[in-house]
Design a protein with these regions (language model features):
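Conserved small/polar residues in nucleotide/adenosyl-binding loops
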Residues: 266-273
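Hydrophobic/small residue at the entry helix of a nucleotide-binding pocket
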Residues: 153
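Conserved acidic E/D residue at the C-terminus of a beta-strand in Rossmann-like folds
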Residues: 172
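Phosphate-coordination loops involved in phosphoryl transfer and adenosine-cofactor binding
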Residues: 1, 65, 141-144, 226
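An N-terminal-biased, well-structured beta-alpha scaffold segment characteristic
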Residues: 1-91, 196, 216
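Phosphate-binding beta-alpha-beta segment of Rossmann-like dinucleotide-binding domains, i.e.
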Residues: 86-88, 93-144, 156-159
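Rossmann-like adenosine-cofactor binding region
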Residues: 53-59, 175-265
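Glycine-rich Rossmann-fold phosphate-binding loop(s) that bind the pyrophosphate
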Residues: 150
Length: 274
């Protein structure tokens, strides 16, 4: 019987579909450390992968592996060279989570602009009189937002930003100005030049040699003091040390980070083991 390895649980409807098919068996892996995944996929014919890492040795270890299906858009967490050598197919779910990510970006933007964590902590701590001492909040109405990357997520995000009456600018060398204009945005040609006039920046670009650390201290210094930067794309696009420095120096208003260059979840022992 063919075996599917589900690395990281998926939506219950997906699990129901798997259960309804008796042509194969499946196993769900919740311990996402690379060594554990490597052990589990030895006899797998197919792997369903979310955000965890599948390096070369984990792929070479799976002698029966024929396909890896990425539960998302990017595939930089998969060693493609190993897949090519073994003729292993790699699939993505291109349209599955565009709206969810766009909503998540907006959630982070609103949470940061309204200092949600600070005010929430103040109320839960019973410090009701402290609110006037907390740092100021800002509106996103009539503010400039730059969407860097205008794929499915960028297109889902622009609709929601326009709903809040934001002024949307788009940076994407592969999308023409007419397409962007039709959706209510304005195309910019130079990311570095445009970013200094923005009140918010949302990153939706792939991680490549060209985009690695594209957001660095030099660029962060040019941004407005009230600028909020959101990264729901890939860790490594923002230089994390530079961002930490910029935040500590109050160069920007805040940052919403959904991804990191190195995720300890896949390399550290699980909480129950420590």
């Amino acid at each position: 019987m063919k075996k599917i390895l589900i690395v990281q649980p998926i939506h219950e409807k997906g699990m129901e579909l798997l259960k309804s098919n008796s042509d194969y068996s499946y196993e769900v892996v919740e311990d996402l450390r690379v060594e554990n995944v490597k052990q589990k996929n030895v006899d797998a014919d197919a792997v369903s992968l979310r955000t965890s890492i599948l390096p070369a040795d984990a792929i070479e270890n799976a002698k029966n592996l024929k396909i890896i299906s990425r539960h998302g858009v990017g595939y930089d967490n998969i060693d493609l060279n190993s897949c090519k050598k073994r003729n292993i197919d790699v699939a993505i779910t291109a349209t599955a989570n565009a709206v969810a990510v766009a909503e998540h970006v907006l959630f982070m933007l609103l949470s940061i602009s309204k200092r949600k964590s600070m005010y929430d902590h103040s109320v839960k701590s019973g410090k009701f009189t402290e609110r006037n001492k907390l740092p100021k909040t800002i509106e996103i109405w009539d503010k400039n937002i730059l969407i860097a990357g205008f794929g499915r997520i960028g297109k889902a995000l622009i609709k929601r930003c326009l709903g809040f009456e934001m002024n949307v600018f788009v940076y994407d060398p592969f999308v023409d100005s007419k397409t962007i204009s039709k959706m209510g945005g304005k195309k910019v040609e130079d990311l570095s030049a445009a970013i200094k006039d923005m009140d918010a920046v949302s990153l939706h670009i792939p991680l490549t040699d060209q985009t690695k650390n594209i957001i660095n201290y030099k660029l962060l210094k040019t941004m407005k003091k009230n600028c909020i930067i959101i990264n729901a794309a890939r860790g490594g696009i923002i230089n994390e040390k530079d961002l930490d420095r910029a935040l500590n120096e109050n160069l920007i208003f805040g940052a919403g980070i959904d991804v990191f260059e190195v995720c300890l979840l896949y390399t550290s022992p699980s909480p129950r083991d420590s």
